Amino acid sequence: MSRVAKAPVVVPAGVDVKINGQVITIKGKNGELTRTLNDAVEVKHADNALTFGPRDGYADGWAQAGTARALLNSMVIGVTEGFTKKLQLVGVGYRAAVKGNVVNLALGFSHPVDHQLPAGITAECPTQTEIVLKGADKQVIGQVAADLRAYRRPEPYKGKGVRYADEVVRTKEAKKK
């Protein structure tokens, strides 16, 4: 049995938590995040900490409580520190630029690729081959990074494409004659 739910989530100073039934709203310096929790989870806010437990009558109560604890911990970290995700473009002529809330990509297609960023996510390009995504919602940051990577995934022979900064691309050997 996992014991993730047994550890409380510490709520730092400057973070406001509102519990309205199963809807939890966490507000901090980086914004406001809201999440609806599973009915099997019971949340209590006391002494600058959130504690989690299962409700009676649910077989998967502890599992859902552990999931809820992990999600709310990510929300607290997001509204205090924020999350970043870095992408690299590898390939001749592969370039990225940010104009407002649109990421412009040149990925070897016959047309440029424009990706609209969702609300709460900012992007910057320190160089033409790097993209840095920042925001408070961990799930949305990961989804935007996955969407950008999906335009041109790293191919296995030369490794060209859009990759995460910490991703290791396994390359294959070329066909032997």
Swiss-Prot record:
Keywords: Ribonucleoprotein, Ribosomal protein, RNA-binding, rRNA-binding
InterPro entries: Ribosomal_uL6-like (IPR000702), Ribosomal_uL6-like_a/b-dom_sf (IPR036789), Ribosomal_uL6_a/b-dom (IPR020040), Ribosomal_uL6_bac-type (IPR019906), Ribosomal_uL6_CS (IPR002358)
Record-level Gene Ontology MF annotations: rRNA binding; structural constituent of ribosome
Quaternary data: Part of the 50S ribosomal subunit.
Naturally occurring in which organism (per UniProt): Klebsiella pneumoniae subsp. pneumoniae (strain ATCC 700721 / MGH 78578)
Function text: This protein binds to the 23S rRNA, and is important in its secondary structure. It is located near the subunit interface in the base of the L7/L12 stalk, and near the tRNA binding site of the peptidyltransferase center.
Gene giving rise to this polypeptide: rplF
Name under which the protein is recorded: Large ribosomal subunit protein uL6
Record-linked PROSITE patterns: RIBOSOMAL_L6_1
